[in-house]
Amino acid sequence: PRRLYGEAGLIRALGELVGDDGGVLSRSPLCQSEVISLLVQLRACYHAVRRDPPQALEAILALLVPPLLTLVHGDGSLGSWQGSWAIDAADLAALVAATGVRTRPLRDVRQWGYQRVTAQKGLLLLDAAPPPLARHARTGCASTLAFEFSHAGQRIVVNCGGAACAGGLVPVRLEQGLRASAAHSTLVIDDANSTAVLINGRIGGGVSEVEIDRRTLVSEKGAGATRLEASHNGYASRYGLTHRRILILRDDGTELRGEDLLVPSGGKGKKGKVGFAIRFHLGPGIEVGLSEDGQGAGLALPDGSYWQFRSGGGQVTLEESLWVDGNGRPQPIQQLVLQGLVSRGGGNFAWLLKKMG
């Protein structure tokens, strides 16, 4: 009876921790992997004493693995979301193998809040949800509408990541900054977070609504693409503007078109113009050269490929950044920043990332 009572409590606790699509309520892939690891160890304890684990344990493992795979890049390592860092491919593969679950990544994990688009060697990940509620997360991040993009296992656009390992190789003083909107590849207004980042890992007010639309496009020539359109209200009350992001990844994976729109939301907000910055944190080892007209850049990747970034009119600058690697170590990287001023009437800012040759 004591064991049955304990098992019932475990299953109840897991039910309160995990959403209907299998994602933990912290929205953190690191937490997702930790829960999976604990359940694998628990199952091993049952086997060690020659007892059968509860059937619900296997069912929950089968529910947890597909969302985790959603946020795995082509190189097999983890994306940098909600405080997680780029956990090593070998560690992730060993964890998934230990579960015994054979499955594929989910593409549209709407309740957990992520979108995954695969296009041959190209892979796009988008955060399409508000940050987690404060009671569910230790390192909640203001990352709504941020994206990561990789091609042939090479990370091209990333988030800084690593807030959850602050205090180790990542200095504690960086934790707050790593949780900020500016530490993610998204648009930021007036250097303000889309959702308030508070001390002790908590999240305050900001984004409460996110709309997401996903569709497949086919041109007259037969070429295809996947289009994601999402918007959030995190800046509406302060600036009277809604951020809408459109991402179109061509089916061959070599061209990503983006458009960031600031749409008047009818709120009061600040008068006059405010600054905005669209940040593209670049993967490790990428060499960058700005174009002469100041509206683009060339990206030389470690694998020898060359990509071009172009803005639809705004000035592009190059700034320093950092990325937390698979060992939890901060590595120096660079970021492209498309910035300018916008009025309460809003504006739209297009950009293109394309593989050359």
Could you describe each region identified by the protein language model?
Residues 19-158, 162, 219:
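Carbohydrate-active enzyme catalytic cores, enriched for enzymes
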Residues 4-5, 51-60, 291-296:
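Short alpha-helical "patches" and their helix-cap loops
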Residues 12, 152-154, 252:
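Secondary-structure boundary elements
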Residues 169-357:
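CBM-like, beta-strand-rich accessory domains located in the C-terminal region of large
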